[in-house]
Amino acid sequence: LTFPRKGDTPRIREYAITGKLQRQFLNGNNSKIRADGFVTAGNVTGTATEEFITSFGQGVEPRVRVFNRAGVQLRSFLAFPSAYRGGVVHATGDVDGDGVEEIIVGTATGTAQVRVFSGTGKLIRQFFAFTKQYTGGIRLAIADVDGDGSNEILASKFSKDPRVAIFSGSGIFIR
């Protein structure tokens, strides 16, 4: 999966392992947006197939979109208040153990806010990954880092500081 760099049409592309283009579609209905962005695949609807989840970088409203494999938009929701234009990073993974992946979003710039949404776009929980004084943005990953069978939320600072904070799926700081 690829999302174009800033300045290009916001077209999502899926490639086979051989490098052959499988499908492509616009991220939303505005081909004039020229921001960078993020795309992941995850099963956030509980169906038999994964969906594509997208968000834009800086300069665009903080909207997350969920598309089916054919590029049809299934859901769309604001991850943060509409005035926030600092960019939205995201990851997907089952962090509550129900068998359906959640959409975990973070601020690409500004305070290190993390929000966990259901696949329908309902806010489940929110927390800060680092102190409110840190304003450099974060990157996210989901993994079972302690081998207990449950996924954790990993947040790293988008800075020279190599610190990674690990949280339970319920947002409790682990280390």
Which residues fall in each region the model found?
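Short glycine/acidic-enriched loop and turn motifs that connect beta-strands
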Residues: 5-9, 57-61, 109-111, 158-161
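A short loop-to-beta-strand structural motif that recurs across blades of beta-propeller domains
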Residues: 11-13, 63-65, 113-115, 163-165
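Extended intrinsically disordered, low-complexity coil regions enriched in Ser, Thr, Gly, Ala
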Residues: 15, 27, 68, 78, ...
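Repeat-based blade/solenoid architectures
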Residues: 24-41, 78-91, 128-141
